[in-house]
Swiss-Prot record:
Residues bound to substrate: R68, S69, G70, N81, T85, I86, D87
Biological process according to GO: dUMP biosynthetic process; dUTP catabolic process
Family statement drawn from the similarity comment of this UniProt entry: Belongs to the dUTPase family.
UniProt keyword Metal-binding, yes or no: yes
Molecular function as annotated in GO: dUTP diphosphatase activity; magnesium ion binding
Involved pathway(s): Pyrimidine metabolism; dUMP biosynthesis; dUMP from dCTP (dUTP route): step 2/2
Cofactor(s) needed: Mg(2+)
The keyword Hydrolase belongs to this UniProt entry's keyword annotation: yes
Species whose genome carries this gene: Solibacter usitatus (strain Ellin6076)
Gene that encodes it: dut
Name this protein carries in UniProt: Deoxyuridine 5'-triphosphate nucleotidohydrolase
PANTHER family assigned: DEOXYURIDINE 5'-TRIPHOSPHATE NUCLEOTIDOHYDROLASE
Origin: domain of life: Bacteria
The protein's role, per its UniProt record: This enzyme is involved in nucleotide metabolism: it produces dUMP, the immediate precursor of thymidine nucleotides and it decreases the intracellular concentration of dUTP so that uracil cannot be incorporated into DNA.
Pfam families, per the entry: dUTPase (PF00692)
Amino acid sequence: MITRMQIRIQRTHPQAILPTYAHGPAEDAGMDLHAVEDVTLEPGVARLVSTGLTLEVPPGFEAQVRPRSGLALKHAITIPNAPGTIDPGYRGEVRVIMLNLGRDAYTVHAGDRIAQMIVTRYEAVEWLEGSLADSTRGAGGFGSSGR
């Protein structure tokens, strides 16, 4: 079952486009974020791309910013800090760090879909310091499960 929540949003740029579900929330978990400016990404260079939006994420939730698979596959464009987190207390503009891993320059145009945003619940953690329970895996990591 899909529940709906309301989140306050403000456009800080006249060309800003509200985040949208391409196929509706029953089929898409992520909403598309759009650029409000033209930005050329040179190979090997990361740039901040503006969305012209500010959010008021409710306490107990975060908004995660993730790459779009089509940009990654077709143009080798990614988001190096993915998933980027928009915390409940942040009120600045949502901007996306975009990195061109390809060989050719890529230009993002105003209105282009540049990332996906997912709003998800998180839990506050209280640490219980002490020894840990045994497990089958133990301290094995970094390829310990085989090829």
